Amino acid sequence: MKWATGPGGSRYTSFLTGTGYDVRLMRLDASGAPMWKSQSVLVEDRALSSTTDYGLASDADGNAYVCYDMGASIMLASFDPAGALRWKKTVGAGQVGRVTVASDGAAWACFIEGSATRVQRFTADGTATLGAGVLLNETGASMFSADIQPSENGAVIVSCVRYTTFTGAKILRAHRVNSDGTKPWNAIGNSVFTAGSLQFGNFPSFIADGAGGAYFCWYATSPLQCFVQRMNASGAVQYGTSGIAVTSTSSTERVSPSMTLGADGRLYVFWSQHTPNSSIYGIYGQCFAKCARQWGNDGAAVEPLATVYSRTWATAGRVGDAVVCFYDDSPSAVQDNIECARMNADGTVSWRTDVATNSGVKYRLTSVPGTADGALLAWQGGATVGASDLFAARIGADGTLGAPPAGTPGDLNGDGVVNAADLSILLAQWGGSGSADLNGDGSVNAADLALLLAAWTV
């Protein structure tokens, strides 16, 4: 299940369904209600017996982009806010399609091709601009794409898992590709870390730092420990050659880190922690600023080590300006409880909320910022082991669950009144999409103008 921002406070979500792993796309309003008559639209009717990961992104005009595999081909499909297909293109032949939107509005896709990664750029009308695409490779090594995020000036950064032998060490390399297809960093990419190895089959995601660079987090083996790294827009690492460990000790196992960039500009990372050869699990976090750990050498306890069935899926999130950690607290193999803890700046827990404690299993937690200082959380699960229904919830900055408070219809600038300033915003978006699409039909038009005028503040 993937998420992307939609216009007017909405969110796009995509998911796989059916016996052939069909790809579907849905748009939800701020209260979580489907905005399309059919609820979801079919992106691709597939007849696959297995599938790989895929990507979802959106642009400033509210259009959605889904990149996925169709047998041996990688496809990129674009939909408008009303759920209509804008275009669909074949990106190339390979596996594991991923997508992002650059600062200039172009959509970028990357995928694994043989032992290398290929990258392509598309304009708003679906025209590929880089010929056969840009190849990211290294002689004698495999270079498999893990994620793609925007950089600056229309460029993107692509992270790749690099290794020379199947059982050998697996590290991360980062490549920057400019809008004209040039690669200003090392031809074989810049190493995110050089010491240690990723877990086999782990392809960690990363996030843009807002300044043309990126933050990375991952966990290494022998010992199982989490690390973070920052690379600037020039490709220079900021946290040493191999990053900074989340703690100064390695007596317990730390895996599956998740990170978010706080409103204060600091990096927050959360992970699952386990005492080896035991049933002792915990959820911990660390804050980084100025290349240093801020929550002590051992990090902060979100949920202290204790004897339970398991504690997993530590997932970083934002509720307004605050940072939260969602996680799974499991008392048994057939019962998972999703919790959310809001963290204070000093690493203490401000509040803790039960998100979902109903009977059944819950896994694959994902989180994205919501509207009105809230956050959205989604997961898979169901009443029985192996169930894979999709669920979502919204949590507010005060820890309460549910839809955001009802605002003033037509108050586009959030000043509490509907007046000429809001009318100006609506007219500037006329014919397109955006926050002035008050009825959620994908276009700012006369129907939205009527709603705004009906709410005009006397």
Where are these predicted regions, by residue range?
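Extracellular, repeat-based ectodomains that mediate carbohydrate processing or recognition
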Residues: 1-405
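Cellulosome-associated attachment modules in secreted, modular CAZymes
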Residues: 400-458
